[in-house]
């Protein structure tokens, strides 16, 4: 597909200033201009080789009165010294408006699907802008229902808030985000914007096909900067997606659901760019501007004037180290943290959400109500006490515990299994239809288990179900089967 990167800005031709390439070092391009034509830091540049598609770059530093250092957002293969460079006179811009709905865009706003080109006169907006002033922000106290039991109960999301799924490799972050897309986007009345940041092209293709199949694509914008693209594209693609979300919030007065997978790749791309620009690394090799870069993205995700942008993000945790500087920098901006546990994934407890480590600022009686807060607190207390007893159980066995502790262990194990549920996005692999559970049913089920109503049930009756009624049916079927087996006539002894 031809590149449309030269259309990633809307400056008039008369405003353009010409320079030429003096050095190319990977994704870094040094460009010389006339003394009075030096572009500003953050401005877009278009490198226009004679025999290749134009390459979009962004000014990162002034090296002298006539030279700038720019970061290319597309491959620099084939560029050479002396290549002409245009400075249109403004920052990188992305197309916004109704025309981008249902489309797949890249970091420059160019279409990357099989649809027609965007209208030539489409409105464009700079991808960099200041966060709204504090006085204009709206608080976040309305629950954002997901239909996922463990999240709605223990780490509820806020309408207009920021939530993230934290986890190492292979614990189910992307599956959880895709289930949220399936469960939430289909019944969401606003606009959805998905930013694929540094993830696999295969996953991006699958998501595009899934959205087409489910019929939600006409109300969704997909913006991809995939794993194979230069660090500049992965570093800037979240801002392109966020700019589109801000347009629908500010101009169309529509609530927006912003999904990002994976925010860690944004930080990782920033570290690559920092190294390419020759900056001194900080802790663990991250860029010295880590906190500033994360804040420049997260602080723009806000609700303004009664219209919300709700963000759900996936965050890769390198080596399962939750003290990693990138992870802690991202976590500082969130309202809800959903932590995925490798040990729970190993036990088959999907979604592998850690009920103790996950948290939300909304889990307060004044926000969620007394009943919800009390049930969530008791569920956490029992599961935490069960974990404290696991060493004793592994050494001596559960029979050595007191009667009260044995009952508590049984309820904790049943709670863990009740908080699992099959997902719609995994139905093709498991054969089990997905379940979406109302919060009231989740609370009622947990209350029944906490009260001991399920103490005699088989644990398997509560595994991978929706509501407690489904578990009750399983238990009744198991009891009926057991009775039938006991009542079956014994086999006749062979004749002597």
Curated annotation (Swiss-Prot):
Its main location: membrane. Keywords: ATP synthesis, ATP-binding, Cell inner membrane, Cell membrane, CF(1), Hydrogen ion transport, Ion transport, Membrane, Nucleotide-binding, Translocase, Transport. One of its GO terms (molecular function) is ATP hydrolysis activity. PROSITE patterns: ATPASE_ALPHA_BETA. InterPro entries: AAA+_ATPase, ATP-synt_VA_C, ATP_synth_F1_bsu, ATPase_a/bsu_AS, ATPase_alpha/beta_chains, ATPase_F1/V1/A1_a/bsu_N, ATPase_F1/V1/A1_a/bsu_N_sf, ATPase_F1/V1/A1_a/bsu_nucl-bd. GO terms for cellular component: plasma membrane; proton-transporting ATP synthase complex. It catalyses: ATP + H2O + 4 H(+)(in) = ADP + phosphate + 5 H(+)(out). Residues 474-496 are annotated as: Disordered. It is a peripheral membrane protein. It comes from the Bacteria. Disulfide bonds: none annotated. Residues 476-489 have a biased composition (Low complexity). SMART domains: AAA. Its EC number is 7.1.2.2. It is found in: Cell inner membrane. Produces ATP from ADP in the presence of a proton gradient across the membrane. The catalytic sites are hosted primarily by the beta subunits. Belongs to the ATPase alpha/beta chains family. PANTHER family: ATP SYNTHASE (PTHR15184), ATP SYNTHASE SUBUNIT BETA, MITOCHONDRIAL (PTHR15184:SF71). F-type ATPases have 2 components, CF(1) - the catalytic core - and CF(0) - the membrane proton channel. CF(1) has five subunits: alpha(3), beta(3), gamma(1), delta(1), epsilon(1). CF(0) has three main subunits: a(1), b(2) and c(9-12). The alpha and beta chains form an alternating ring which encloses part of the gamma chain. CF(1) is attached to CF(0) by a central stalk formed by the gamma and epsilon chains, while a peripheral stalk is formed by the delta and b chains. This is ATP synthase subunit beta 1. It comes from Paraburkholderia xenovorans (strain LB400). The lineage of its organism: Bacteria, Pseudomonadati, Pseudomonadota, Betaproteobacteria, Burkholderiales. The gene is atpD1.
């Amino acid at each position: 597909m031809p590149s449309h990167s030269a259309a990633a800005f809307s400056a008039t031709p008369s405003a353009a200033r010409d320079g030429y390439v003096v050095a190319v070092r990977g994704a870094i391009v040094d460009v010389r201009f006339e003394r009075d034509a030096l572009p500003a830091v953050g401005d877009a540049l278009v490198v226009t080789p004679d025999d290749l598609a134009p390459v979009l770059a962004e000014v990162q530093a002034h090296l002298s009165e006539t030279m700038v250092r720019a970061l290319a957002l597309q491959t620099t293969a084939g560029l050479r010294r002396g290549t002409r460079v245009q400075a249109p006179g403004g920052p990188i811009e992305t197309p916004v408006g109704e025309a981008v709905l249902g489309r797949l865009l890249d970091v420059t706003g160019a279409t990357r699907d099989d649809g027609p080109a965007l209208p030539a006169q489409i409105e464009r907006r700079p991808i960099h802008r200041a966060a709204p002033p504090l006085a204009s922000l709206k608080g976040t106290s309305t629950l954002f229902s997901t239909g996922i039991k463990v999240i709605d109960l223990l780490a509820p999301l806020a309408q207009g808030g920021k939530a993230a799924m934290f986890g190492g490799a292979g614990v189910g972050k992307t599956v959880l985000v895709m289930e949220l897309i399936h469960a939430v986007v289909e019944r969401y009345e606003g606009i959805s914007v998905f930013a694929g940041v540094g993830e696999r092209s295969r996953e991006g293709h699958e998501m595009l096909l899934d959205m087409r199949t489910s019929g939600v694509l006409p109300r969704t914008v997909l913006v991809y900067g995939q794993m194979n693209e230069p660090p500049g594209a992965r570093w800037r693609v979240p801002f392109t997606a966020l700019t589109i979300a801000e347009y629908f919030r500010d101009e169309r007065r529509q609530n927006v659901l912003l999904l990002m997978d994976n925010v860690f790749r944004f930080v990782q791309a920033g570290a690559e760019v920092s190294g390419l620009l020759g900056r001194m690394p900080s802790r663990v090799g991250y860029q010295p501007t880590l906190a500033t870069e994360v804040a420049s993205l997260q602080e723009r995700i806000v609700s303004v004037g009664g219209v919300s942008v709700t963000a759900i993000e996936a965050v890769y945790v390198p080596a399962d180290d939750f003290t990693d500087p990138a992870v802690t920098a991202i976590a500082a901006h969130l309202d809800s943290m959903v932590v995925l546990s490798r040990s729970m994934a190993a036990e088959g407890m999907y979604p592998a959400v850690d009920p103790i480590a996950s948290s939300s600022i909304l889990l307060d009686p004044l926000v969620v109500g007394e009943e919800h807060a009390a049930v969530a607190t008791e569920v956490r207390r029992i599961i935490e006490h069960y974990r404290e007893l696991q060493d004793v159980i592994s050494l001596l066995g559960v029979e050595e515990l007191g009667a009260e502790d044995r009952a508590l262990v049984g309820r904790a194990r049943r709670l863990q299994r009740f908080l699992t549920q099959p997902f719609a996005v995994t139905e093709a692999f498991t054969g089990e239809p997905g379940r979406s559970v109302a919060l009231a049913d989740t609370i009622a089920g947990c209350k029944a288990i906490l009260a001991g109503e399920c103490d005699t049930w088989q644990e398997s009756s509560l595994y991978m179900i929706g509501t407690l009624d489904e578990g009750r049916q399983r238990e009744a079927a198991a009891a009926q089967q057991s009775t039938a087996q006991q009542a079956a006539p014994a086999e006749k002894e062979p004749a002597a």
